[in-house]
A protein has these predicted regions:
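Short intrinsically disordered, low-complexity coil segments enriched in acidic
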Residues: 1-3, 265-266
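Bacterial Sec-dependent N-terminal signal peptides
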Residues: 2, 8-12, 16-20, 30-63
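Sensor of tandemly repeated, compositionally biased sequence architecture
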Residues: 7-8, 219
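Alpha-helical transmembrane segments
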Residues: 25-29
Length: 385
């Protein structure tokens, strides 16, 4: 389970024309010119088509998924921020449906007109109408965590070692396959499904059955590849150039968190030292948050890099009115504003139970504003029209 209380949780349980002649000459010249240009650009990576249909715009609503806190019986839910009217609805799901979303929601994606939200603690994937926020279906599946969509299917990682496939027409699970211990993040790329295998509960043996991302065929769920990555891989992000970025959380002690990059040939290597990321086009926004658990002090570093070259891009990101304790970040695909979710306090007694915040910065990283949201904000989703 990707719990935003990962660090404390593990400490707790272990202590992307004039004639045909000239026509032919012109065609040949154009052909050879094209060849020369292609050779000159051999090192440039192809940009993939956008993952959303052309003309599909974002609305003014930002869904902030909040985990709550199971230990203290604080329910999960989501806050809706309307950036056009500057309103915040803290009980968006509850107010429409008259019931709670579920325990420990982990991820949220929009596919078509529906939102899919795995709720780990309730063993449910909640399917919600993206416009009205009315609950359409509760789909039973064991300890659901990551979620991604491809065509007519939605794929869900189940922490019990499986991936379930949901048919989006019938809204039922039509196939399940074993993938490895404690799968977390799920992503799609070039018509394949990629799943991070964390072995996250095997901390005593160094997560030794993890360190990998498995590649599945979406139609059969047959495993067609396995990619070695860092320790304890969790969320997976992707750019517009065929790269996947895997957040490997380490062991929260001697092995620091890293972001690994997987290229189009499924070759993986360390890309950066960070535990949180957001990708927009060719930019990856990185957050490295470390806590000294003997003092409770948290140190946060921010960086923006080019996803292709890895070079640092100059930005004010994280330098002006930074959040206290970042838990998630995302970039608005329309405005390019950067949103960073955070816990609301560093007080060890209330750190994981107090309401959180979402800070907004422009594309240069300059601070714009801050919103109050629910407890343990873990996902920022820009809803499409």
């Amino acid at each position: 389970m990707i719990d935003l209380q990962f660090s404390s949780f593990y400490f707790y349980i272990s202590s992307m024309t004039r004639s045909s002649f000239f026509h032919r000459i012109s065609a040949c010249l154009l052909f050879f010119l094209g060849v020369l240009l292609l050779n000159a650009c051999a090192d440039e990576e192809r940009k993939l088509p956008p993952t959303s249909p052309a003309g599909e715009g974002t609305s003014s609503q930002v869904l902030v998924l909040c985990q709550g806190n199971q230990a203290t019986r604080l329910p999960g839910g989501y806050t809706l921020i309307d950036t056009e009217h500057q309103t915040v609805n803290h009980d968006a799901f509850l107010s429409v449906n008259g019931k709670l979303l579920g325990d420990a929601p982990q991820e949220a994606i929009q596919h078509g007109a529906k939102i899919y939200i795995p709720c780990y603690g309730s063993n449910l994937v909640q399917v919600v109408d993206a416009s009205s926020h009315r609950l359409l279906r509760s789909i039973s599946t064991s300890t659901p965590e990551g979620v991604a969509a491809w065509g007519k299917y939605v794929f869900v990682s189940n922490n019990d070692g499986n991936v379930s496939r949901i048919d989006t027409l019938s809204l039922t699970v039509d196939r399940t396959v074993a993938v490895g211990p404690n799968p977390v993040g799920v992503s799609t790329q070039d018509n394949y499904i990629y799943v991070a295998i964390s072995d996250g509960y095997n901390y005593k043996e160094g997560y030794k059955q993890g360190f990998k991302v498995v590649k599945l065929h979406p139609n059969t769920l047959e495993q067609v590849g396995e990619i070695r990555v860092g320790m304890n891989p969790t969320r997976i992000y992707k750019d517009d150039f065929g790269h996947l970025f895997v957040a490997c959380q380490g062991d929260y002690a001697t092995h620091a968190a890293e972001i690994w990059r997987i290229d189009q040939k499924d070759q993986a290597a360390v890309f950066a030292s960070a535990n949180l990321a957001a990708v927009d086009g060719h930019r990856i926004y990185l957050v490295r948050s470390t806590t000294d658990w003997s003092t409770g002090k948290t140190t946060v570093q921010y960086e923006v890099r080019d996803t292709r070259s890895g070079t640092t891009i100059a930005s004010h990101f994280g330098q002006v009115q930074p959040p206290l304790d970042p838990t998630a970040l995302a970039v608005d695909p329309h405005t390019k504003n950067i949103y960073v979710a955070s816990r609301g306090t560093l007080d060890p007694k209330t750190r994981f139970t107090e309401p959180g915040t979402v800070s907004v910065y422009n594309d240069n990283g300059d601070f714009l504003q801050r919103y109050n949201v629910g407890t343990e904000p873990c996902v920022l989703l820009f809803l499409r029209k």
